[in-house]
């Protein structure tokens, strides 16, 4: 590992001041933030709260065709992303950007942004620039995460990673370019559609989600945690990593959806909590899949977290208890949607179930 981070920085980080008002202020306040304490997620009896067996994953909301909804939203997002990154000089970096950005993927984050915007009274067109911005940043983070100095991954979305095709130098530049493009795209395309004060808030929310109070913090602690003895690391430590590294961008996607749709402060907080729950859920399931599925099924290298000595939920609490945590988080996410129009909330209920039951 080329990057060395000392674990003492973890304790210093969580004691630091100056975080955003709505940020995760301490790994010990998980219950306050999401309604789920580390221990409460492990209290299901007799395995009854585990992830539903294959074939039953759609029972939570069988009347809503989430598969069709997801396909249609992904098509809309893909078309908007394609237009946002035309081929132009310098061609090599533009090709590298397009290679990763248009490589497919589930588009969970832009879908979340759009679904939330529609939930609070907005529409897809109003949310699309923010949805694309979130996906650009997500792709940027994947390009950088896959680098040899980070996770050293060879496959992403079933294809060779960006640095394997274009080289490490070009991959770094492509990731940087996507990060800058995200903010330019959201502000320029939304001009005239969203009030300036709301756009300023959206920019701040997104910036905080990916900086040292968000994604960067999670990645730093993740790197520092490699090869740690799981017996000496608590569940709160792992949740801190993933509330920042994974959930922070999902949280931003949801909050941006509310902002773009003209939602209220109360709606922002409810959907912020929903996103935190599905963010943790996404990572728990990701850890489970890493040790239960093949490389072909995942579209990325299976077992790489184990080989890298990373902290994961199965490593820390075991496979069965990880499944219990996942189901608990799914239910907690759905509870945040109570009080909304059920028909408009249906995509978000189905999204939580989809994340819990996905196979890649």
Curated annotation (Swiss-Prot):
Cofactor(s) of this protein: Mg(2+)
Role: Catalyzes the trans-addition of the three molecules of IPP onto DMAPP to form geranylgeranyl pyrophosphate.
Gene Ontology, cellular component aspect: chloroplast
Cofactor binding summary note: Binds 2 Mg(2+) ions per subunit.
Reaction catalyzed: isopentenyl diphosphate + dimethylallyl diphosphate = (2E)-geranyl diphosphate + diphosphate; isopentenyl diphosphate + (2E)-geranyl diphosphate = (2E,6E)-farnesyl diphosphate + diphosphate; isopentenyl diphosphate + (2E,6E)-farnesyl diphosphate = (2E,6E,10E)-geranylgeranyl diphosphate + diphosphate
MF term (GO), any: dimethylallyltranstransferase activity
Name this protein carries in UniProt: Geranylgeranyl pyrophosphate synthase 3, chloroplastic
Protein family per UniProt: Belongs to the FPP/GGPP synthase family.
Subunit: Monomer.
EC class of the enzyme, as a word: transferase
Region (Disordered): 24-54
The organism's place on the tree of life at top rank: Eukaryota
Pathway annotation from the record: Isoprenoid biosynthesis; farnesyl diphosphate biosynthesis; farnesyl diphosphate from geranyl diphosphate and isopentenyl diphosphate: step 1/1; Isoprenoid biosynthesis; geranyl diphosphate biosynthesis; geranyl diphosphate from dimethylallyl diphosphate and isopentenyl diphosphate: step 1/1; Isoprenoid biosynthesis; geranylgeranyl diphosphate biosynthesis; geranylgeranyl diphosphate from farnesyl diphosphate and isopentenyl diphosphate: step 1/1
Keywords on record: Carotenoid biosynthesis, Chloroplast, Isoprene biosynthesis, Magnesium, Metal-binding, Plastid, Transferase, Transit peptide
Subcellular locations according to the entry: Plastid, Chloroplast
Sequence ranges of Polar residues compositional bias: 36-46
């Amino acid at each position: 590992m080329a990057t060395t981070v000392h674990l003492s920085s973890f304790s210093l980080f969580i004691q630091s001041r100056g975080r955003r008002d709505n940020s995760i202020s301490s790994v010990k306040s998980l219950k306050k933030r999401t309604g789920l304490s580390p221990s409460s997620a492990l209290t299901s009896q007799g395995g009854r709260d585990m992830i539903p067996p294959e074939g039953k994953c759609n029972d939570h909301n069988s009347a809503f065709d989430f598969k069709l909804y997801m396909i249609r939203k992904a098509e809309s997002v893909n078309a908007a992303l394609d237009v946002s990154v035309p081929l132009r000089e310098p061609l090599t970096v533009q090709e590298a950007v397009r290679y990763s950005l248009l490589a497919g993927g589930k588009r969970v984050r832009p879908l979340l942004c759009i679904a939330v915007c529609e939930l609070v009274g907005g529409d897809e067109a109003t949310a699309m620039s923010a949805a694309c911005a979130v996906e650009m940043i997500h792709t940027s983070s994947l390009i950088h995460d896959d680098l040899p100095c980070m996770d050293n991954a060879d496959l992403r979305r079933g294809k060779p990673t960006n640095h394997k095709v274009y080289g490490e130098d070009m991959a770094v530049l492509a990731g940087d370019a996507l990060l800058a493009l995200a903010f330019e795209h959201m502000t320029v395309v939304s001009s005239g559609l969203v009030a300036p004060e709301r756009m300023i808030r959206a920019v701040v929310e997104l910036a905080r989600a990916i900086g040292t109070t968000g994604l960067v913090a999670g990645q730093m602690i993740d790197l520092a945690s490699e090869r740690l003895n799981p017996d000496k690391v608590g569940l709160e430590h792992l949740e801190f990593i993933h509330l920042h590294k994974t959930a922070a961008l999902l949280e931003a996607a949801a909050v941006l959806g509310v902002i773009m749709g003209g939602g209220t402060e109360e709606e922002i907080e409810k959907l912020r909590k929903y996103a935190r729950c599905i963010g943790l859920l996404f990572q728990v399931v990701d850890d489970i899949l890493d040790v239960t599925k093949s490389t072909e099924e995942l579209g990325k290298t299976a077992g790489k977290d184990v080989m890298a000595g990373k902290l994961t939920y199965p490593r820390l609490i075991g496979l069965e208890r990880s499944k219990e945590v996942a189901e608990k988080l799914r239910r907690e996410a759905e509870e945040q949607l109570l009080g909304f129009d059920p028909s408009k909330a249906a995509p978000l209920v189905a999204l939580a179930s989809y994340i819990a039951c996905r196979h890649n």
